[in-house]
């Protein structure tokens, strides 16, 4: 039997909607990255974009285990002398743009390169319950039910 290599015209893309409420951030990011890359499909081909579209809602209710909300920090530099800035994961989650927390976690779980950048564009993250993608008839994926460790109660 020969090795199958998918062609871009043969790829059937689905839409998934994932509710992030109470789900552990890292476990959620792994599942999203696999869906975006198409690793859940039998026709997965490393050099072809076989991934699906993923819509994540309730990004502000994602769960961080341990003391990561207070202790883990994102750093950036303004470019000016002494311009190092930082923000904790809890501040980002509770701030104006909680979707950036999930976006950054998924981005760091994908390979770096032009194909991964194209796959990453199929991720849409929303802080609240509403999303404008009902016309695509997305399939609801219950990440919390896949594994008991995916969801934390407190």
Swiss-Prot record:
Q: Which GO terms describe its biological process?
A: negative regulation of translation; translation
| Record's keyword terms, sorted | Ribonucleoprotein, Ribosomal protein
One GO cellular component assignment for this chain's record is: cytosolic large ribosomal subunit
Q: Give the domain of life.
A: Bacteria
> Molecular function (GO) terms listed?
mRNA binding; structural constituent of ribosome
What Pfam families does the annotation carry? Ribosomal_L13 (PF00572)
SUPFAM superfamilies from the entry? Ribosomal protein L13
- Is the keyword Ribonucleoprotein assigned to this protein? yes
Record-annotated membrane-spanning stretches: none
Q: Which PANTHER family match?
A: LARGE RIBOSOMAL SUBUNIT PROTEIN UL13M, RIBOSOMAL PROTEIN L13
Family named by the database record: Belongs to the universal ribosomal protein uL13 family.
Q: Could you describe the subunit structure of this protein? A: Part of the 50S ribosomal subunit.
Q: What does this protein do?
A: This protein is one of the early assembly proteins of the 50S ribosomal subunit, although it is not seen to bind rRNA by itself. It is important during the early stages of 50S assembly.
Q: What's the protein called, per UniProt?
A: Large ribosomal subunit protein uL13
Origin species, per record, is Rhodospirillum rubrum (strain ATCC 11170 / ATH 1.1.1 / DSM 467 / LMG 4362 / NCIMB 8255 / S1)
